[in-house]
Amino acid sequence: MEFNLKGKYGEAKVFADIIDDRTTGQIIGILNTPLGENSHVRIMPDCHAGKGCVVGTTMHVSNKVCPNIVGVDIGCGMLVVELGKIDLDLKIFDEIVHKIPSGHESYEEPSHDEYSGKRVSTSELQWYGSGLIHCNENHPGNWFKKLKCFNELDQVPRLIGNLGSLGGGNHFIEVDVDDDGNKYLVIHSGSRNLGKQVAEHYQKIAKKQYVSKRRNEVIRMAKAEGKEKDLQEILKTFKLPVWDETLFYLEDEDMQNYLHDLKLCQEFALWNRRMMALTIIERYFIETIGAHEDVVGRYKDDKIVFVSKTINVGKTAKSVWTYNFFETIHNYINFDDMILRKGSVSAKEGERLIIPMNMRDGSLICIGKGNEDWNISAPHGAGRILSRGEAKNTVSLEEYKEAMKGIYTTTVSQSTIDESPMAYKPMDSIVENIKDTVSIEKIIKPIYNFKASTEEPIWLKEKE
């Protein structure tokens, strides 16, 4: 199903069956600002109301941009590592995953001392090759200084410690399996607190920029009407107009500074996910097949190559492992075609992508069709049908546990109930609405799931 919505400055096409009044209002809100002018706004099937704008928005960016539309979790997305027909000890795997900082944790915290050394050696891999980090020659803080807004950042050491950490909310680490028995490591995370600080900083600038322009406009009009003597009184009573201040936008130099920092945040988010994948897989080899601490993974094109110079005698003779991987980003601006995607993903012709449904039903692995009418985009998930508050108030823990039967997880609890399968739209409603933009290659089902919980993690309990 698709329909159009119109506003003062533009029109949007909505590809959705299920949409509520608040979501509709937020779409029209964008169209009632200059942001909607000639922006080719397309709304994805998983759309729902978000903080300040609709999750599921795609639009073209030219001479203005609103940081709130991209959002605070800049560069958030999914990393998929194809593990093949590997046998996994999920108990050991879970213990390793619990040592990845999640929620508000970071590697700067003393409780992660036993992993911090491993983290540093791991981060040397290709961080310097990407220009992001070289642990020996350049302190990580030097990379952060590339940000135009560096001097406005708070707690930079903690931001550095967030590299390779999961975060909370709907972020997860999962192992899925397809019908042929192939397993997939799936990691969903973003730019952590860095993206939040950058987004909020530039949204404040957008407001200041808008207020300044409006004030200058009032002054100009007063002078043109011969009311200069009344100018001070006029300025006291002038009001900010018309639309929600969450949609104030940047132009000119401020916009270019934002785009510069946005690109860096997107890079940070990408390597944050890659860091976690390397740490998990390296540690799993060390714990299960006798690989010594020298095992190191490196990213090369669309592959991860792990090498160990020494293997414990009698365990295995293999010392090189190669896995394919791909990534799907959903809160970002694509600088190749200047398409902004907020809760939506790229679906270029032939492009492989993942669309997660929920922690019970797994994900769709799809191939993009390059549909221009869809802004070459697809939904980033099933989309919420219950807000976090509604889920906590209406879904019982027993119902949640029942839904997750058969999936290895130690994080099903009251604190993650807002991410339960019942909080999301049914898979069928998404599958039926994406045929024009992607073809479904396969459905992968979870056998393991981890979400950040406010409860004390297992690895910390063991230290007591």
Regions found by a protein language model. Name each.
Residues 102-109, 113:
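Long, low-complexity, Ser/Thr/Gly/Pro-rich intrinsically disordered segments that act as flexible linkers
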Residues 78-79, 85, 112, 126:
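Long, basic N-terminal domains or extensions that often function
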Residues 2-29, 36-43, 49-57, 64-67, ...:
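Domain-length cofactor-binding catalytic modules of enzymes
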